[in-house]
């Protein structure tokens, strides 16, 4: 079992228990705002693989401005760093959402970041100067 940690610059500490899915990048406006960049780099994990060791998270729930579904962002109460998001898509969304989407840039260990993203989401919102990730599945919207 492999663990990945996030704690270096922040007032929180969490562990991710591997294995988990490959990263994806998202081009939608909410993800840009969460990441403070042209895309977000996301790492979906099962809730049981995410272990908050220190700190307290604050949640805020919003309506996705591009697609209309509800999503929650969990962030550090002290430093404001976004840690993960959860999207609620579809008729059974609240009951089925058990997949924190970790903001991959918060990890101390760059191991999960070394491989290119397996998929790109919301490519219809991709900025014109941002290139396609070679070999990544391309999705017009959230999967």
Show the residue positions of the predicted features.
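A short Gly-Trp-Pro
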Residues: 2-5, 12-143
């Amino acid at each position: 079992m492999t663990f990945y940690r996030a704690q270096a610059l922040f007032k929180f500490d969490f562990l991710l228990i591997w294995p988990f899915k490959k990263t994806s990048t998202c081009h939608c406006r909410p993800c840009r705002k969460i990441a403070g960049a042209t895309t977000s780099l996301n790492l979906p994990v099962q809730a049981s693989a995410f272990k908050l060791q220190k700190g307290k998270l604050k949640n805020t729930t919003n309506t996705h401005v591009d697609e209309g579904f509800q999503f929650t962002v969990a962030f550090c109460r002290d430093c404001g760093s976004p840690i993960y998001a959860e999207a609620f898509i579809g008729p059974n969304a609240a009951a089925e959402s058990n997949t924190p989407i970790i903001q991959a840039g918060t990890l101390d260990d760059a191991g999960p970041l070394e491989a290119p993203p397996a998929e790109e989401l919301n490519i219809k919102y991709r900025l014109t100067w941002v290139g396609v990730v070679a070999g990544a599945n391309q999705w017009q919207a959230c999967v």
